[in-house]
Amino acid sequence: MDKTILKKKLVLGSVNFTQKYGVNPKQIKLSEIKKIFSLAKKKNVMIIDTAESYITKSNIFKNLNKKFQLITKIIPSSKWTSLSYCEERIKNHIKKYNNLKIKTLLFHDTKILFTKNGPKIFNNLEILKKKKFFSQIGISIYNIKELDYIIPKYDIKVVQCPYNLLDKRVINSGWYSK
């Protein structure tokens, strides 16, 4: 195993908080979610991975310690070419998460980056980053080959991709070491 991977920070995934997902598809009860947040804080796991598509209940993040930060995913459409629309969507997104700080904003689906609207949308997000709505822009991918197009064209700081005992595509492709 590549020991550099072990140096990365742990992030708390939240998709099962509102949806049935993964190898053990169960939705977690609110009482259990509170226990998970408490344990995460105790163990200094202060980053939560989430997405606008995960939130169906607004009370999950209510009263959560403001020291938690988010890595959150969005699915922009062509409407995001409007800076004011982008800003409004991000503000609404932040409100849904009880005004927690967004550390990293990820494209949940990168298809828009391959279109003529991609550069304009990315530029709008760069403007919002400068306004301190979030600290970094990244992508969430399943197809490692997308990196060949996206990385040279956009200033991506974070790539979220599958990695586990059975799926080491990011390592085998050479992208992890770049």
Can you say where each PLM-predicted feature lies in the sequence?
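N-terminal binding-site loop/beta-alpha segment at the start of enzyme catalytic domains
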Residues: 1-69
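Conserved, mostly hydrophobic/aromatic
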Residues: 12, 40, 48, 70, ...
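Active-site beta-loop-alpha junctions enriched in small/polar residues
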Residues: 15-17, 51-53, 73-77, 107-110, ...
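Active-site mouth loops of central-metabolism enzymes
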Residues: 17-31, 74-85, 111-114
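Short, acidic/polar
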Residues: 25-40, 81-98, 141-150
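Acidic-and-aromatic substrate-binding clefts and catalytic sites of carbohydrate-active enzymes
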Residues: 49-59, 77-84, 112-116, 166-171
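Active-site groove signature of glycoside hydrolases
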Residues: 95-117
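Beta/alpha (TIM)-barrel catalytic core signal, keyed to glycine-rich beta->alpha loops juxtaposed to Asp/Glu
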Residues: 109-178
